[in-house]
UniProtKB/Swiss-Prot annotation:
Lineage: Eukaryota, Metazoa, Chordata, Craniata, Vertebrata
First and last residue of the signal peptide: 1-22
Keywords noted in UniProt: Glycoprotein, Membrane, Signal, Transmembrane, Transmembrane helix
Residue intervals on the Extracellular side: 23-233
Main localisation: membrane
Source organism of the structure: Mus musculus (Mouse)
Keyword Transcription in annotation: no
Pfam families per UniProt: Mucin15
Protein known as: Mucin-15
Residue spans of biased composition, Polar residues class: 124-162
Post-translational modification: Highly glycosylated (N- and O-linked carbohydrates).
Chain segments carrying region Disordered: 124-186, 302-331
Disulfide cysteine pairs (residue numbers): none
Transmembrane in keyword set: yes
Compartment list: Membrane
Amino acid sequence: MLTLAKIALISSLFISLPFARPQKQNPRRNVTQHTIEDVKIMRNNSIHLERSINVTSENGSDISNLMVTTPSPLNLSTTFRTTNSTRTWLMTSSSESSRPSSTYSVPPLVQGFVSKLPLNSSTADANPLQVSEHSNSTNSPSPENFTWSLDNDTMNSPEDISTTVRPFPPPPKTTPVTPFTAEPTEWLPTNNDNFAGFTPYQEKTTLQPTLKFTNNSKLFPNTSDTPKENKNTGIVFGAILGAILGASLLSLVGYLLCGQRKTDSFSHRRLYDDRNEPVLRLDNAPEPYDVNFGNSSYYNPAVSDSSMPEGGESLQDGIPMDAIPPLRPSI
């Protein structure tokens, strides 16, 4: 429990620091400092926290004095400095039916600490108040008109201020915030030099008509296409003519080759064309011919007759020429 008490004391110190920061003093606000030296001993692990809230109203100013004393088993004196919170309202003078109430919330402390606060305020309560762990004091002003001033940064409120203490904090209220959008109802003036040449209206751009291209090749033939067409026609005609000439040449070569392969025909030819040419005589041969040789030699009785002397001629010693028909005229 001693360790728990130390932890609670340290946590309360750190939590109460933002509420004890010194601020700019206002002549209509008072700052009080109290030094506490009284420390009591813990009893049966049940300690109560007594808190006294002093609220004074001086010329419309709110003063809240918060004093907290935590006892320690070591009897150590602890000094807390509480500073009255100063609220500065930067608003113009206006009158409203009701303003949001100022709420002072006490940080959560461990239940079980006992403290006594000195009663140094004129409006302090006679009896100490016992507050639970989550206690808060709410100052609700009466629904009257408030006056706000920018000169002295003060708030004037009626003297009738009621102090209420609630054992449990009310549930947090969330107020929906609607974003404010301002739309100009008329055109802004353009007298400034920065707007020179600026037109408030939206410029409309006119679209030029698109150009349509039509194919007039049939109506007006292009001269550049004529040579190409003629060239293509010439190529086709030349290919056809070349094929014909090639076929003719091949047929001619084949004909000539086939004509030379024919065999030569037998032709009769005369032994002599001139009658004055001497005729070959068979009797001049050194040996006598065989008359029976293939029955191709003519009969010569002078050769076959061996009784005849050599060199002797007989009447029948020549070739008979009477039977030879007359010569035909040469063609």
